[in-house]
């Protein structure tokens, strides 16, 4: 396995797919990285030379990935909570942040249902 940005990427997959195993690198970013490094997208990771791996590593280092990106996202959320914005309040309460309805669904953010005792008629 080749190590790029502290992540072991799979050897048997194409390079463009293997790069998506790095947090913060999707398919489009992976294509841009390979274009900058001058490596074909169809190449398998096991067929890469050390020179090509080095160029890919340099290209990936220009992007905000892995721990730095996770830290940035968590600090952004913490900042929203501290300034008391609407989005920060939604984060604090564990509710959807982007305007979704919450009457029926939003189970991912709310967690499992908490059943209430039956109301007497």
Swiss-Prot record:
Source domain of life: Bacteria
Any single Gene Ontology cellular-component annotation: small ribosomal subunit
GO BP term (any one): translation
Region described as Disordered: 92-121
MF terms (GO), sorted A to Z: rRNA binding; structural constituent of ribosome; tRNA binding
Role, per record: Located at the top of the head of the 30S subunit, it contacts several helices of the 16S rRNA. In the 70S ribosome it contacts the 23S rRNA (bridge B1a) and protein L5 of the 50S subunit (bridge B1b), connecting the 2 subunits; these bridges are implicated in subunit movement. Contacts the tRNAs in the A and P-sites.
Family: Belongs to the universal ribosomal protein uS13 family.
Annotated protein name in UniProt: Small ribosomal subunit protein uS13
Record organism: Oceanobacillus iheyensis (strain DSM 14371 / CIP 107618 / JCM 11309 / KCTC 3954 / HTE831)
Organism lineage string: Bacteria, Bacillati, Bacillota, Bacilli, Bacillales
């Amino acid at each position: 396995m080749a190590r790029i940005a502290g992540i072991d990427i799979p050897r048997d997959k194409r390079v463009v797919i293997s790069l998506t195993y790095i947090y913060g690198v999707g398919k489009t970013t992976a294509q841009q990285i390979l274009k900058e490094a001058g490596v074909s997208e169809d190449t398998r990771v096991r067929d890469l030379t050390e020179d090509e791996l080095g160029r890919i590593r340099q290209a990936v280092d220009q992007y905000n990935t892995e721990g730095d990106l996770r830290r940035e996202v968590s600090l952004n959320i913490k900042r929203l909570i501290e300034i008391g914005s609407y989005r920060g309040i939604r984060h604090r309460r564990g509710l959807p942040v982007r305007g979704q309805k919450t009457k029926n669904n939003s189970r991912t953010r709310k967690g499992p249902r908490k059943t209430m005792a039956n109301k007497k008629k």
